[in-house]
Amino acid sequence: MDPESKPVVLVACKVLLGTVKGDLHDIGKNLVAMMCEGAGFEVIDIGFNADPEKFVEAIKQHQPKVVGMSAMLTTTMRAMGYTIKAIEEAGLRDQVKIMVGGAPVDAEFAVRIGADGYGSNAPAGADLAKKLVGIA
């Protein structure tokens, strides 16, 4: 790929990414964002320490197909479940696929909190996003 060229953006395929409330670690989320952009997604990054309401408002505003949440700490993992619950309570859960990741997170935890998938690293996160929207 020519260094000056930009990746082809998948029409209407937005991925919303954020690190959950209480967590200030965003390197992993940033890597997933870069991988998703490289895969052709439009990425909306709501940053770190994002509370459930910030995710809900961003979903309403940007209408992504995929929402990705990151947590680096065991103490902030629960915020993922709270965020999914807030998305459900806002009536938005059927509009998005949710993927989770981060050092303390695993596939079993993802199932337990109601996520649609788990990415063990940045490339896996981008691959999962493609799978969740049916292009992989």
Regions from the language model: what does each represent?
Residues 29-39, 44-115, 121-130:
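Cofactor-cradling patches in redox/metallo enzymes
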Residues 1-24, 28:
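Long amphipathic N-terminal alpha/beta scaffold segment
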Residues 131-136:
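Short, charged, intrinsically disordered terminal tails
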